[in-house]
């Protein structure tokens, strides 16, 4: 049976040789094994680790550059937005001032137009009143003249006799001939 043990574990024949080998159990490793493992890792893994670290470094640097570029872009956009905001505020203030000025101008124009229209209406009213007064006066004159003429006719008809009519006709004929002779002598 001891041969079976030697076949299964060849190190058991050599007691000193049984202690040489890699012990991968971290708790049981000794300093030499750690040195060998670390040395092997440093020798063979140096390039791999260096490449990984360089790639990681490039990724980080690119990320930083991108972040700085985005920061600069954002800063520039913020500055542009602030400039645009200032322009908009200035324009809004300018529009507000122009609006106030325009309102004052239009207010004065409306007051002037209302005053002018009021004066024009007053003049039109006065003209209409004057024309109505003239029309009424003319109508009163006609009425008075008509009444006076009717009264005169009534008086004349009452006083006018045939003798008086003959005397008046003779008087008018004499007056006409006298005027006619004066105008022919000239």
From Swiss-Prot:
Keyword Thylakoid on entry: yes
Record-annotated membrane-spanning stretches: 26-44
Bilayer topology annotation: Single-pass membrane protein
Membrane in keyword set: yes
GO CC annotations, alphabetized: chloroplast thylakoid membrane; proton-transporting ATP synthase complex
Keywords assigned: ATP synthesis, CF(0), Chloroplast, Hydrogen ion transport, Ion transport, Membrane, Plastid, Thylakoid, Transmembrane, Transmembrane helix, Transport
Top-level taxon: Eukaryota
CDD domains: ATP-synt_Fo_b
GO MF term set: proton-transporting ATP synthase activity, rotational mechanism
Location relative to the cell: Plastid, Chloroplast thylakoid membrane
Something else known: In plastids the F-type ATPase is also known as CF(1)CF(0).
Quaternary structure annotation from Swiss-Prot or TrEMBL: F-type ATPases have 2 components, F(1) - the catalytic core - and F(0) - the membrane proton channel. F(1) has five subunits: alpha(3), beta(3), gamma(1), delta(1), epsilon(1). F(0) has four main subunits: a(1), b(1), b'(1) and c(10-14). The alpha and beta chains form an alternating ring which encloses part of the gamma chain. F(1) is attached to F(0) by a central stalk formed by the gamma and epsilon chains, while a peripheral stalk is formed by the delta, b and b' chains.
Similarity section: Belongs to the ATPase B chain family.
Summary of the function given for this chain in its UniProt record: F(1)F(0) ATP synthase produces ATP from ADP in the presence of a proton or sodium gradient. F-type ATPases consist of two structural domains, F(1) containing the extramembraneous catalytic core and F(0) containing the membrane proton channel, linked together by a central stalk and a peripheral stalk. During catalysis, ATP synthesis in the catalytic domain of F(1) is coupled via a rotary mechanism of the central stalk subunits to proton translocation.
Protein's name according to its UniProt entry: ATP synthase subunit b, chloroplastic
């Amino acid at each position: 049976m001891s041969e079976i043990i030697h076949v299964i574990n060849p190190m058991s024949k050599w007691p000193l040789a049984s202690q040489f080998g890699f012990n991968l159990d971290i708790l049981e490793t000794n300093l030499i094994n750690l040195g060998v493992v670390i040395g092997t890792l440093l020798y063979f893994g140096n390039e791999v680790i260096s490449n990984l670290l360089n790639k990681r470094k490039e990724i980080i640097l690119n990320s930083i550059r991108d972040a700085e570029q985005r920061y600069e872009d954002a800063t520039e956009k913020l500055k542009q937005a602030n400039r645009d905001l200032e322009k908009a505020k200035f324009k809004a203030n300018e529009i507000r001032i122009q609006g106030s000025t325009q309102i004052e101008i239009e207010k004065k124009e409306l007051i002037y137009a209302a005053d002018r229209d009021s004066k024009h209406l007053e003049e039109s009213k006065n003209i209409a009143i004057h024309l109505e007064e003239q029309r009424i006066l003319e109508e009163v004159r006609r009425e008075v003249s008509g009444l006076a003429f009717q009264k005169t006719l009534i008086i004349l008809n009452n006083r006018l006799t045939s003798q008086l009519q003959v005397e008046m006709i003779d008087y008018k004929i004499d007056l006409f001939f006298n005027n006619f002779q004066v105008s022919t002598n000239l």
